[in-house]
Amino acid sequence: MGEIDVFFLDEPTNHLDLPTLEWLEKFLAKFQGSQLIVSHDRFFLDRICTHILEIHDGHTRGYAGNYTAYLQQKELFLQTLADRIDKCEKEINRLTGALQSMKRANNYDKSISQKHQMLSRSQRELKWLKKLKPKERRGLQFNLQSTEKSSLDVLDFKHATLKFEGLNRPILNKVEIGVRRGQKIGIVGANGAGNTTLLRIINKEIQLDDGVIDVRPGVEIGYFHQDHRTLDFDLTPVEQVQKLKPRMDYGDIRAMLGQFQFTKEMVSTPLKKLSGGERARIAMLKLLLEENNMLLLDEPTNHLDTDAKEALEETLQNYDGCIMTVSHDRWFLDQVCDTIWELPGDGTIVVHPGNYSDYLRRKGKA
């Protein structure tokens, strides 16, 4: 590596488990050369990058610092820009009013030429400022509400044991652990530790070898599969919604799909011809239309752009039901989760109160 001066990295964290992500970050932090990185992994950008280059509407803008610093500077820039636009518009209105008053009074003194020049200058400035303002994208709108609340105890693992044939270690080994109403749990561990398997056990897709999972009455589970297997890929987005809600008015369906950024052409395109991100939005919409008070989310931010991730995070923060999520998106885990379940790979589950950053601090990895 001593001969390499620069790395060009295109989505380097895709498909990596958390231990490998941590190794990559340590390696890149020690690398003495330059790095040009394209990534949607906000946590990774926060830990590695010293400058952020934003591309928006065909324009680029640079920000010094990591991803958090970029967010802060961008917010300040947009607020300052909005203030300058407002001030400029008020000055144009003032000058226009003054010129109109002078015209009505037939009072053409020496200042009229100066005022015309000031008005022209302010109009040019306003035009320039508005060019700096990013075009507002139609935001993705989630509206997630739980059904009637479940009991305080949502579910319990009792002596839960599972081992796969050919694997020399258990996935679960006599696990005793519970989930409470309103908890938002992030499940982390190396690939193969059983993260997704845990969700599938709760969803009764996989049976335990021993023990039970006691799901309390009134618990309604919604499951987001990372491969979107609950969708019918031969259907269009409209047909997928009609299948779930046959009595919903067509106009309401179109309006709802519009809120999820589906155009007129896209709503009549079979899902198999849509992108991964577009299918992910349909899978999330399907989940929102179902009546549930517990969500099992398997890599819910895969294929979503940053705006969609932020919309999803805000929605899940306000969701009053229970959430259990498997995700390699550490920024997402920070924003949504209040508890981390760590699967070390020995059949146990270690509970860490707090979000992912709290978990790292306890592990001495922050």
Predicted regions and their residues:
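ABC ATP-binding cassette signature C-motif
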Residues: 1-85, 149-366
